[in-house]
A protein has these predicted regions:
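Transmembrane alpha-helical insertion/packing segments
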Residues: 1-65
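Juxtamembrane interface at the cytosolic side of transmembrane helices
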Residues: 2, 60, 70, 174-192
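Alpha-helical transmembrane segments of multipass membrane proteins
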Residues: 15-23, 47-48, 82-90, 174, ...
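Membrane-interfacial segments
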Residues: 26-34, 55-63, 93, 97-101, ...
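Hydrophobic secretory-pathway targeting helix
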Residues: 41, 57-61, 68-98
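Functional transmembrane-helix hotspots
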Residues: 89-131
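Individual transmembrane alpha-helix segments
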Residues: 140-173
Length: 192
């Protein structure tokens, strides 16, 4: 039985949403942002790679001869469909269904940035020997710390349509690179 690219794309979408709601229901805590980032960095690329792999191998078993363009398309289209539907659904959920989850993610993002700034400051302070350098570091640290003032971060929103568009553009680069790999690896080589 041959599955078309839309079927594989929809299966990738379903798997992505299962992961998203799994984290939402079971990981909605003080580490929600970090858990989401780890899954986006490690689990989701593996999931999309498997979806593309099964799409290409299923097609190759059916037709036997496959060129670069066919293999590329069979890898890219399911990832694009699954990714687009997932991005749209997650955007709609965070912006219209549960805005508290969006607020929590935004807050945890800002707190993470603040913690990283403090860690860098403490490391740099230990390394510097000259008093002038330490004073300059303290001055820059205090300036940067001002950007985390509550009135400046209260309207910070990482989940705008614009940011989702930028993120999806970056993900499309991943899809293109991965599809190029699949197209090169799974095409039939002909000797002329």
């Amino acid at each position: 039985m041959s599955k078309n690219v839309y079927t594989f794309g929809f299966l990738i979408f379903i798997a992505t949403m299962l992961v998203f709601f799994g984290v939402y229901f079971f990981g909605y805590n003080t580490n929600y942002f970090n858990t989401s980032m780890l899954l986006n960095a490690f689990l989701m690329p593996a999931l999309y790679t498997l979806g593309a792999y099964f799409s290409v191998t299923t097609y190759k078993k059916e037709v036997k001869e496959i060129g670069f363009r066919d293999a590329f398309g069979r890898a890219f289209k399911p990832m694009f469909i699954g990714g687009f539907l997932s991005m749209f659904s997650i955007f709609a959920f965070l912006n219209y269904v549960d805005t508290d989850a969006k607020d929590l993610l935004n807050h945890q993002y800002v707190e993470r940035q603040k913690t990283e700034l403090e860690n860098e400051y403490n490391k740099a302070k230990q390394i510097l020997a000259k008093k002038e350098d330490k004073e300059e570091l303290d001055k820059k640290y205090q300036e940067r710390l001002q950007s985390f003032a509550p009135e400046l971060v209260k309207d910070k929103d990482m989940f705008t349509f614009r940011n989702f568009t930028y993120f999806f553009a970056a993900v499309l680069v991943f899809y293109t690179i991965l599809s190029t790999f699949f197209g090169t690896f799974f095409r039939n080589k002909t000797l002329e």
